[in-house]
Amino acid sequence: MAPIKRGDRFPTTDDVYYIPPEGGEPGAFELSKFVKTKKFVVVSVPGAFTPPCTEQHLPGYIKNLPRILSKGVDFVLVITQNDPFVLKGWKKELGAADAKKLIFVSDPNLKLTKKLGSTIDLSSIGLGTRSGRLALIVNRSGIVEYAAIENGGEVDVSTAQKIIAKL
């Protein structure tokens, strides 16, 4: 599938999972209901605890979350295929456990990732097929206003600073 681009409707699937902020067991994240009439930023990453994601990509979004939200964004959605328990631990490790507007969702079967046209094959280093790195701005009508899709493992066009400049 071709990568998502400006003007495309943001695809939804309810086959993504999370652990609610109040805790408990993992459950389905009703993406189709949650995103309705909201403006949001999507950040897709290859994997929790991987050096580029943990040291370069996500820290910018965490540090700049108040600034992003001040631009009329309702929340930032982080997507990767790791399970919800790993994502909860990663969010805590990143110092963002209490950031309710930063939502980490698991796409274990890559259904959403495939709809975004953003998979990356990391089999050569033992990681299999993963979510590719990208960032999107989605408006309240569910249309992608801006799409930044990285080549391979780069961390450049999808950084928080570049997304803020487009908000």
From Swiss-Prot:
What processes in GO biological process is this protein linked to? cell redox homeostasis; cellular response to oxidative stress; hydrogen peroxide catabolic process; methanol metabolic process
Induction or repression: By methanol.
Q: Which UniProt keywords apply?
A: Allergen, Antioxidant, Membrane, Methanol utilization, Oxidoreductase, Peroxidase, Peroxisome, Redox-active center
Catalytic-site annotation from UniProt:
53 (cysteine sulfenic acid (-soh) intermediate)
Fetch the SUPFAM superfamilies from UniProt: Thioredoxin-like
- EC number(s) given by UniProt: 1.11.1.24
Listed Gene3D superfamilies: Glutaredoxin
Q: Name one GO molecular function term.
A: thioredoxin peroxidase activity
User: A cellular component term (GO) from this record?
Assistant: peroxisomal membrane
User: Per UniProt, what is one Pfam family of this protein?
Assistant: Redoxin
Q: Which family does it belong to?
A: Belongs to the peroxiredoxin family. Prx5 subfamily.
* Name the record gives this protein: Putative peroxiredoxin-B
| Organism (species) | Candida boidinii (Yeast)
- The gene designation is PMPB
